[in-house]
């Protein structure tokens, strides 16, 4: 299945590192609601170690937070999935705290998006 054929934008970790949040948001049509699929394995494991398959070199937690926050202000977010949290692989509560920060930003972005007309 080709995601782009169906109008789905997919960004790899490397693409996220090369692009600014605003450049990514500009690729999303204003009149189409956004669904965010967030795989925690792709976030820098030094900041979020609580995953099964950590990938070094991924975007920072602050970058992902900034991107989600900006999306919530500029586009209508339809929904979010948040996958691959694995508490058994956490270092203390580092990954838990990072995940909670992400969830807080996601909830805030979803609340902000309710103010945006499609």
In which residue ranges do the predicted regions lie?
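Conserved alpha-helical scaffold segments that buttress catalytic/binding sites
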Residues: 1-118
């Amino acid at each position: 299945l080709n995601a782009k054929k169906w109008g789905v934008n997919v960004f790899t970790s490397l693409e996220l590192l090369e692009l600014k949040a605003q450049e990514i948001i500009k690729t999303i049509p204003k009149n189409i609601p956004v669904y965010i699929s967030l795989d925690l394995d792709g976030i820098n494991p030094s900041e979020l170690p609580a995953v099964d398959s950590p990938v070094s070199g991924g975007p920072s937690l602050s970058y992902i937070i900034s991107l989600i926050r900006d999306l919530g202000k500029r586009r209508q977010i339809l929904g979010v999935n948040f996958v691959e949290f694995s508490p058994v692989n956490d270092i203390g509560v580092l990954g838990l705290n990072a995940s909670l920060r992400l969830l807080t930003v996601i909830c805030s972005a979803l609340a902000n998006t309710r103010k945006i007309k499609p």
